[in-house]
């Protein structure tokens, strides 16, 4: 959970900007997007497998 204490003489716009940065860094938005819809375990495994294949392909191409 992200907590933000508004500093002395800090405008609302500055506080909101700081809050957005904290949320982005904590990964909350990314996690919300990922959990927005249910994904079958087979789809999760498939996505992970494809990501690993791409990563391996990239490392093989770079090592040549």
UniProtKB/Swiss-Prot annotation:
GO terms for biological process: translation. One of its GO terms (cellular component) is ribonucleoprotein complex. Residues 37-64 are annotated as: Disordered. GO terms for molecular function: structural constituent of ribosome. The keyword Plastid does not apply. InterPro entries: Ribosomal_bS21 (IPR001911), Ribosomal_bS21_sf (IPR038380). Keywords: Ribonucleoprotein, Ribosomal protein. The keyword Ribonucleoprotein applies. Coiled coil: none annotated. Residues 37-53 have a biased composition (Basic and acidic residues). It comes from the Bacteria. Residues 54-64 have a biased composition (Basic residues). Belongs to the bacterial ribosomal protein bS21 family. HAMAP family: Ribosomal_bS21. NCBIfam families: S21p (TIGR00030). This is Small ribosomal subunit protein bS21. It comes from Rhodopirellula baltica (strain DSM 10527 / NCIMB 13988 / SH1). The gene is rpsU.
């Amino acid at each position: 959970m992200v907590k933000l204490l508004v500093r002395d003489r800090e405008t609302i716009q500055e506080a909101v900007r700081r809050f957005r940065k904290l949320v982005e860094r904590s990964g909350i938005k990314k996690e919300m997007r990922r959990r927005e819809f249910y994904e079958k375990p087979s789809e999760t495994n498939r996505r992970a497998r494809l990501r690993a294949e791409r990563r391996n392909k990239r490392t093989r191409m770079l090592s040549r």
